[in-house]
């Protein structure tokens, strides 16, 4: 599930983080390229808002650069922090940059649908935007920050 952020957690710099840039070669079906620090990944995603199947393939820097010339969206740039939360889960806090500056989202992935639906978010989480298509990374890369 995906949420806006009501308050940035304290001591953010103590958590592991990655610098991510990503763009979409296609939005239907979803085909994404991503650079996360020094890793390069091509992802193909299935349909669905909360539960989606993904196929990931590691690619090299040269392949990433070649595929970058084929994208149909702008690049999304963000810093992702991995923050442990209750229940042995991790919250992925994304702080967006460039044309999305000021946008913060947090996402939690669950082992099953029952745990997903019974999840009680920590106080620092804001509004649940899991079903709001404007906050999908594909929409952000096409249309920018929602009003």
Language model regions located:
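Phosphate-end processing signature that detects enzymes handling 5′-triphosphorylated RNA
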Residues: 2-147
